[in-house]
Swiss-Prot record:
Name of one Pfam family that matches: GTP1_OBG
UniProt keyword terms in alphabetical order: ATP-binding, Cytoplasm, GTP-binding, Hydrolase, Magnesium, Metal-binding, Nucleotide-binding
Top EC class for this record: hydrolase
CC per GO annotation: cytoplasm
PROSITE patterns according to UniProt: G_OBG (PS51710), GTP1_OBG (PS00905), OBG (PS51883)
Binding site for ATP: 166-173, 191-195, 213-216, 280-283, 309-311
Protein name: GTPase Obg
Domain OBG-type G: 160-328
Function according to Swiss-Prot or TrEMBL: An essential GTPase which binds GTP, GDP and possibly (p)ppGpp with moderate affinity, with high nucleotide exchange rates and a fairly low GTP hydrolysis rate. Plays a role in control of the cell cycle, stress response, ribosome biogenesis and in those bacteria that undergo differentiation, in morphogenesis control.
Self-association and partners: Monomer.
GO molecular function terms attached to this record: ATP binding; GTP binding; GTPase activity; magnesium ion binding
Family: Belongs to the TRAFAC class OBG-HflX-like GTPase superfamily. OBG GTPase family.
Matching HAMAP family: GTPase_Obg
Amino acid sequence: MQFIDQACISVKAGRGGDGIVAFRREKYVPAGGPSGGDGGKGGEIVLQADSNLQTLLDFKFKKFIVAQDGRRGGPNKCSGASGKDLVLKVPCGTQVRHQTTGIILGDLKHHGEILVVAYGGKGGLGNAHYLSNSNRAPEKCTEGKEGEQWLLHLELKLLAEVGIIGLPNAGKSTLMSVVSSARPKIADYPFTTLIPNLGVVRKPTGDGTVFADIPGLIEGAAAGVGLGHEFLRHIERTRLLIHLVDAAAARPIEDIAIIEKELFAYGHSLMNRPRVLVFNKKELLNEQCLQKLQAEARAFTNRDIIFISAATSEGLDELLKNVWEKLEI
């Protein structure tokens, strides 16, 4: 399935139905009188969060969305039927804003949560409303109002408590596949992961925590190089970051600095987000190299440092224990 995390759509709520001019003509109503009914209200356009959806793909080809108009009024003061509301399902984590003003209309985070993005027009009034002592047979009625029409920008920001970040080929997908039920694509070349992957990791209590494997970031990501800016938005909502580093890389400390620089450049308080520094592929280094790397990392940062092997599962218990403790703070 193609992963689409942004969409621009035009929405138009239904127009209100017109009121009508009508009069009582029954022979048993000798006085007659106006009986024109009101028009029905136009249908609204509603967005609803659905936890079964993971992408905005449905809106890739659905660019112009129109709700049903209200029906015109009828005789005998019968109101026209209101237009049917149009409910559009979106993934949990979808933020909605006006395309032109940038104003955020809402943030749909929880399953079933709804947001009305375009209100239907009011129905017009029938001539029964204009009966007065001076006008016993009014010929006046009003038209229904147009429904609201907006250009909206939908943006999906994944809802995960823990984000796994790092340069390409650091082993993020392998780690995700080991600690969760997710099965991301894994291969020994950079940029294997091209979309964020979500997985549920079980705590010792049995409760689930959502982890997000963010595709590999590169230098300049915060400025839009590669797809970095597209991916960085998905860690805005996380409570904790696992910064995964390839311990066997040529310059692992420089690799750490690259990601730190991108987090700072992107902003959104990512630099202040709690995180743990994790060196992966420890099985490829001897004890002397591991100690040297740990000393260099200690000189670079005061964050918790953990060495693991996602391939052999060594160190994963220590990592998850650290994660659970940080999430409890």
